[in-house]
Amino acid sequence: MEKWWFNSMLSNEELEHRCGLSKSMNSLGRAIGNTSGSEDLIINDTDKNIHSWSDSGSYSCNNVDDLFGIRDIWSFVSDDTFLVRDSNGDSYSVYFDIENQIFQIDNDSSFLSELESSFSNYLNFSYLNSGSKSDNRYYDRYMYDIKYSWNNHINSCIDSYLHSEISIESYISSSSDNYGDSYISSFICNESVSVSDNGSSSIRTSGNGSDFNIRGRSNDFDINQKYRHLWVQCENCYGLNYKKFFRSKMNICEQCGYHLKMSSSDRIELSIDPGTWDPMDEDMVSIDPIEFHSEEEPYRDRIDSYQRKTGLTEAVQTGIGQLNGIPIAIGVMDFQFMGGSMGSVVGEKITRLIEYATNGSLPIIMVCASGGARMQEGSLSLMQMAKISSASYNYQSNKKLFYVSILTSPTTGGVTASFGMLGDIIIAEPNAYIAFAGKRVIEQTLNKTVPDGSQAAEYSFHKGLFDSIVPRNPLKGVLSELFQLHGFFPLNQN
């Protein structure tokens, strides 16, 4: 696997002209000097207009050992110009123009290689010895691994460019005793970047076998909103996850491993074998039984709004399918639909699912994600707790069938007080928020402070409330083993 480095500190007048950019050079502070210490510009022909990438013979930059301060360099660096170095040491200058769909590469590196070397030495000396990056936010763009083909490299370059637009925190690491062998890689962060109260962010640096922290200010960071639709923000570490790959990673944060919310459709795709899903009662919708009206928005209008937003008819999807070849009945709640609240339609769909599984002797999986009973339906929503529990009693106690309850974040209120806690096996996701009454309700009712973490899945697990905490990655395999232990086997086995 080849590794490519994208360094941002490589644009100067030569690149400004060669890339067809017109950025003024009048804002230059102290110039890139030579070994004699001269203050004259080594590259100072600002009147020339060079539009070809291959036209660089009139420029030279020899014996460069003195660079701008980081902030000075950023006063004239082009955001669209990068240096790419492959594993063979060959350097390329890369130009991006997203709006005009231009992607150009030039491998004439007579100037770039020397500038890159000087910049690398400067970074190693400045950051690893002075221990400060307070004047720098952008000294590196992104490190990307390239596989298979040059086409993939181009795609990776574009992805890296998008990463760099919102990158503010970088990590310097070294696996050797020689700082010159260090490589620099950037990680994508969001507005907060796990910033402490004083507004500083940390950089973890490794060198000579020792670790230490460098603190840098990030108060002046203003994230680029242009590519916000490309990223999913983690609720825990505030890191950004590339949306293109986020679904394939089961909505798990790449930075901290936190399990973010999943839609019911994604959970069905995660659990059910392809081509085996058969939904039930899709056309069942609420008719506003108590004619609940709100000053902000009528109940029926709110239902219609969530139906358009999510593509669902209600806050739960029920149906039958196969899990590793084992026929099952499954119900999956969707928190995106009115907070996964349980109204009369949700209760009826779950009850019908349990009755169908009872008649067909199928195991049941219920994936819970709910804020509780739906207040817009009053006591009718509370009645669903008793109705579902009654059907579950017949399924479990009389028919001796197997019910697995999976609690995800959040699971609260009437769902927790009914079928959420009635499973023969109760599984929770890591860090899931699980409670009967929410923290705010308890504090307002009892006038007492609820300790942080007291309603997290890990705390409840240690108190014996669940059977297991299972991450999403192995969940399907765990469920398959549980079913086989209870006598439910794949259809293709004798």
UniProtKB/Swiss-Prot annotation:
Gene Ontology biological process: fatty acid biosynthetic process; malonyl-CoA biosynthetic process
Known pathway: Lipid metabolism; malonyl-CoA biosynthesis; malonyl-CoA from acetyl-CoA: step 1/1
Annotated GO CC locations: acetyl-CoA carboxylase complex; chloroplast stroma
Subcellular location: Plastid, Chloroplast stroma
Entry EC number(s): 2.1.3.15
Zinc finger (C4-type) in chain: 234-256
Broad class of enzyme this protein falls into: transferase
Cofactor note as given: Binds 1 zinc ion per subunit.
SUPFAM superfamilies: ClpP/crotonase
Top-level taxon of the source organism: Eukaryota
Cofactor (UniProt): Zn(2+)
Catalysed reactions, as listed in the record: N(6)-carboxybiotinyl-L-lysyl-[protein] + acetyl-CoA = N(6)-biotinyl-L-lysyl-[protein] + malonyl-CoA
Pfam families, per database record: Carboxyl_trans
Record-listed Zn(2+) binding positions: C234, C237, C253, C256
SUBUNIT field: Acetyl-CoA carboxylase is a heterohexamer composed of biotin carboxyl carrier protein, biotin carboxylase and 2 subunits each of ACCase subunit alpha and ACCase plastid-coded subunit beta (accD).
Biological role: Component of the acetyl coenzyme A carboxylase (ACC) complex. Biotin carboxylase (BC) catalyzes the carboxylation of biotin on its carrier protein (BCCP) and then the CO(2) group is transferred by the transcarboxylase to acetyl-CoA to form malonyl-CoA.
UniProt similarity note: Belongs to the AccD/PCCB family.
Name of protein: Acetyl-coenzyme A carboxylase carboxyl transferase subunit beta, chloroplastic
Organism: Drimys granadensis
Lineage of source species: Eukaryota, Viridiplantae, Streptophyta, Embryophyta, Tracheophyta
